Amino acid sequence: MEEADKRAEELRAQIAECEATLQSLKEQLAAAEAAKTPPYSDSTETDRGSSSSTWKWPLAEAEYERYGRQLILPSVGIQGQLRLKAASVLIVGAGGLGCPASAYFAGAGVGTIGLVDGDTVEASNLHRQVAHGTSRVGMLKVDSAISYLRELNPLVKYNAHQSHLTPENAESIVSGYDLVLDCTDHPTSRYLISDVCVLLRKPLVSASALRTDGQLIVLNTPAAPQADLSGGPCYRCVFPKPPPPDAVTSCGEGGILGPVVGVMGVLQALEGIRLLAAGRHLSPSPEQQQTAISPSLLLFSAPPDGSPAGFRSVRMRGRRKDCFACGEKSALSLATLREGGLDYVQFCGGSRKPVALLKSEERVSAEQLNALLQQQAGEHGKPVLLDVREREHFEIANIPGAINIPFSKTQNPGARHNAEDTPKLDWLPDGVADGHSPVYVVCRVGNDSQTVARQLKEFGLDNQGKRFIGDVKGGMLAWKREVDSTLPFM
């Protein structure tokens, strides 16, 4: 068996090496093909057999062939294509949104595409982040995405910004681009990106996706100066206050359906291409002042019950007079940003802090729980293990004997009292409320379990301290680390 495992490992290593070599050859081929393409110039020289003549058309021959299907659209045409070619787009985030968005910008022939991301590719990314591949796991996302984009279209210039966007580097990075896409997944980055776009007068296309829902909005278009209320609203105009930290759910916690985030990323590219082809990113002459398009928030939902997926548009107001970033009395400045005068983490409520609702003696480690479960029933009976993860997590993997009670069900106020207003937890299994067996609560990482354990105590299930009720420190993540390393953890 060990010999077979060793051989399998050797084969995997050889496959990875061959895939890396193949990827390198593909990139060399793309570079060679790009080198033979007539350069971007109105006076490109092209060889026709043994003779040469002056190329008199505004695009190179390869570009007419590549972009022909969109060139014949009234909304693009030759002028629109020339605007796309001359334009530059910055995509902040090379993940589920940034991958499809960057692919369609590259396919459309946008002249320069910049990618900002400091993360590396993980296997858990691959079901939705379509520019990455198995052979590039561990590679910086911007490098992985650009290798994919170069193969898609070698005629585009690609810039890799191998770090996260911060208040200190935002100005130097964003200033070199005509349009910005917010493809991040956290409020702190969304407010930062919006603020720097206001200060540098850059249009912004922002989107988000979680579970089976998504939303998109075009901001700061037209990109008027601060205090000019004729400009498009910024992110702070739409969301003056950030959501509380506990209400922010990541893809890792809430899940995401790949095509949903793909739809939103493609829509970001669509809005960006429309904006660039129409020249709405360009500063108009005085007689051609742009008028702000009535902003709207586009909502997408693919209901899990199988009903038809669809879109809904919600009209939004324009710029707010009292907006901190773009309003009439805004004090926001590039100097403040450069000097770190704005703490976006603090503004958004800080990092989510570990929950500390129970005393240390009310908590057990995963190893301790495992030992307790292996023992014979004590004088108070066999321990009761309540797993308060949502059903989908529980069904993937669970501890044998655990009873699943989804946390969302435990927080339903209507289920806490019976008709006579006597304290009762209707979601508890029969026999648990009136029994004497110790109760252990486990969740994903040890936060929700504390909430439920305290709730059980508040309703008197601990028999005035005679019955143990507590939780498992670190939750199922600790169980994987300390007890069962094979447990699939989501």
From Swiss-Prot:
Co-factor binding comment: Binds 1 zinc ion per subunit.
UniProt: Zn(2+) binding residues: 234, 237, 323, 326
Keyword tRNA processing annotated: yes
Catalytic activity: [molybdopterin-synthase sulfur-carrier protein]-C-terminal Gly-Gly + ATP + H(+) = [molybdopterin-synthase sulfur-carrier protein]-C-terminal Gly-Gly-AMP + diphosphate; [molybdopterin-synthase sulfur-carrier protein]-C-terminal Gly-Gly-AMP + S-sulfanyl-L-cysteinyl-[cysteine desulfurase] + AH2 = [molybdopterin-synthase sulfur-carrier protein]-C-terminal-Gly-aminoethanethioate + L-cysteinyl-[cysteine desulfurase] + A + AMP + 2 H(+)
SUPFAM superfamilies, per database record: Activating enzymes of the ubiquitin-like proteins
Sequence similarity: In the N-terminal section; belongs to the HesA/MoeB/ThiF family. UBA4 subfamily.
Protein name according to UniProt: Adenylyltransferase and sulfurtransferase uba4
Primary gene name: UBA4
